[in-house]
Curated annotation (Swiss-Prot):
The keyword Cell cycle does not apply. It comes from Escherichia phage Mu (Bacteriophage Mu). Pfam families: TMP_3. It comes from the Viruses. This is Probable tape measure protein. Disruption phenotype: No tail is synthesized.
Amino acid sequence: MTGKRLKASVIIDLNGNLSRRSRQYSNQINALSRSGQSSLRALRMEVVRVSGAIDRMGSLSTRTFRMLSAGALGIAGVGYTANKLFIGAAAQREQQIIAMNSLYHGDKVRAQAMMAWAKQNAKDTTWGLSGVLDEIRSSKGFGMTDEQTKQFITMLQDQGAMHGWDLPTAQGASLQLKQMFARQQITAADANLLTGYGINVYQALADATGTDVKKIRDLGTKGKLGMKSILTVFRTLSEQSKGAQASAMNSWDGMFAQMEANLLEFRIKVANSGPFEEIKNEMRRVLNWHDMADKSGELDALAENIGQKFLTTFRTVKISAQELWRWLKPGKDALAWVDQNIVSLKKLAAVLVSVWLANKALRAGWAVAKPSWQVASYPFKTGRRMWRWMRNRKRGQAGLPVPDAMTSETLLQGIGIQRVFVINWPRGFGDYGSGGGRRVRSGGRMAPLLPRQPLLLSGPQPLALPAPRPVLALPPPGVPVTARPAPLPLPGKSGLLSRLAGSAAGQLVTGTVGKLADAGRAVGGWFSGIGNKLAGSAIGRVVTKGAGALGWMGKGAGRALSRLGGPVMGALQLAPVLMDEQASTHEKAGAIGSTAGAWLGGAVGSLAGPLGTVAGATLGSVAGEYLGGFVTDLYQKWTATDKEPQEQKVNAEASLRVELGEGLRLTSSRVTEDGMGLNIYAGDNYITGW
């Protein structure tokens, strides 16, 4: 296809009367439109009706679902509460009784007696029934009798209350003492380990026997402290801490433990009054049904039925997925063909992103650069305009003269315009008629929209009543106008005449004030933005006072700069130097740099508080004055005047190269902006993956 030119011809053959056929076609289109409108109107009514029915059904379904959900949640809550408060407690107690019976080898009398003692001990101590029963089983396992077990547990509970043990710590000390009891010997290792729990075995034996501690330690080292010494230690420890647990029961933890034990007994009584047995009977029925169904094969049939339903569901999902893929595959293939033969979708997406990025960057860059461009272009545009004015004046081009010493009366009479008075001016027209007109408030009084001017008409006119409602009228066509030397260039927009008509000093002052106002607005906006961002960040929250001072400088200075044409303090600092004709450009620039440095230094120093503001302003002023030469050009730009800043020309280029071969394929995309220095190239070397 490369190098060939393709041509396609489209031929429209109109047979018969074109106008008649056009009317027929128009009538058919109108009929089709009316029919379509009727059909769509009817369809809309049906859609609205069906939508209303769906809404009603949805409301009913939602209400029903809420009722079912509330009922299900209620049932679940009742079941959970019953299981947690009653059934679970009864099941745990049942398990404890079974364990106790097993411990006594089926002797239910001894088991019940020990269970009764454990219940009472749990009410009188902070261990709880589970802790007491665990300790009973452990003590019996180490070979203690029932009486020794009771005395040992009581001694251990009193020692725990005296030393402030919790249940795990008490169980650790208990294990070490029971190992010593089972070994029937007190070793040095036992004594050292028990010291960590606050129990001095050697000292307890020395106090009980009246023997020196060193002698007891030597006996322990030699392994001569047997069962008699162990029982003496237990008895001594019990006497040392006797009653400590009873005193602990008067504390908050003790009363709470006692209340918990009483509540547990109440829950077990409620469960054992009938509900627990009923639930157990229902569970037995379920288990019996399971056994019968398993034996008869019914359980296997039920499992097969459920498995087949799951299998059918899985197959349906698979078929649906395959059918969906069958419909999606053509679209996928079409996109793949486009990606391979016409344009890479990845490259196309990158091109779109690059174009969007270039657009945003150009807009953002112009928004930032426009104020700087206006300031920078002022001296050049002013010089160019003055040069054009001088050139036109030398060439003697014709134009409307503006004499330096000529009154408006003389000027207007010279071109054939004289003053007349009108008394029948329309009412309400710009406040010239008696009806007045819309006025604009200015300086505390209402000013008319149009200024009062003499009504001037060309040619000799008789005077009317002396009620001046003056406006300006030009002479009629045909009246000759004398050509005069070229005047100063008149502006295309209002407002520039007042500046150009003044002296060079007036132009300098006006431009300086205007540029200070623009700079004030920009500086105020920047400070305000910095203050707002710092106030919302983590640093802003830490240095709240500094951020507040920065925000004050931004907002307050912004308002003052925009309304007064520059900061008051800045104007007071700059005025003596800028208005001094003998001051050099470098000195003026130094004054500007000193003021700007004071502003910025004070803003940064405000992060450290009021003293930081003063110090920062002072240092910034000194640094800015030394950098005055750097801002010389900035001062010269501020002194220029222009109401019409020339819009910056931005040269942007967007190119798309298409290579024709076996198919159409996008090879590159380039966006270049010469004015702002922005170059975005969508090629292999700039964007990864191209």
